[in-house]
């Protein structure tokens, strides 16, 4: 059976514009909170294929999105590379021993060995594929090497990225060595996700905006393109979505390139600009400001504006970043319904 989401990713004509939401399997859903409480904590939920499968399917069943996205976390990669991930309540993810030297890099587990330890992810994918409706697609994902490296070097989330940037400008070779090692793991990780059954790949560069535009290609984009090239060489029919958040200047200068299918547009980048610069080359995904979900009227206004720009061609509806935990479920449903309405779903 044809999957409308996969067709849309490949730029094919579809009867309406499909929609999903970043972080759609998450805290705004009471059903998710119940399963998370049963799991004990966030990491336990990631490591439990049965429960991770359940929360992956929830937004498809409850909200009506056209694709499921695997429930996991980008930081399971450095965790299995040997970095000892923990989640501290109220503070987020932490690594107890951040990378400071080449010796730290050399100690990390690399390549296929690290990717091979993520069996719980592949088991989750297989379970989801058994239970997901045939007309719905499953999105697998990874963090971009730069975004992963920020946590590995800083030891936690950061607003300034000063430790990473100090390395970028004072010891770029060390940073490139970290990025290269992470890139190799990501290649094998995404290959194994595809082999397990995902239909589409998304690469999240959540902290792309931390890099000045003139350095973005060198320290992030080229590594994302390397991953896409590797996957396309083996799985040419598997669509790849790139989502670098907060790089309008990079887009405006015409610096985006690479062998991928869909460009995810964040809410801070005008859709008209993305269409002008990228619309002929890539399908565009996005880009409603997530806080509009607090108001059904604001949601409808934005959905109609995006539809006016894109005209239902070479487009996938999404938010311009993740859905927030206190959004009413009814408003999330309204967003999905409005995306379907304006694009002509019967």
From Swiss-Prot:
Query: Which reactions is this enzyme annotated as catalysing?
Result: uroporphyrinogen III + 4 H(+) = coproporphyrinogen III + 4 CO2
Q: Which domain of life is it from?
A: Bacteria
Give the site residues for Transition state stabilizer.
Answer: 73
Q: EC number(s) on record?
A: 4.1.1.37
What function does the entry list? Answer: Catalyzes the decarboxylation of four acetate groups of uroporphyrinogen-III to yield coproporphyrinogen-III.
* NCBIfam families in the record: hemE (TIGR01464)
| Complex and partners | Homodimer.
Name of the protein described by the UniProt record: Uroporphyrinogen decarboxylase
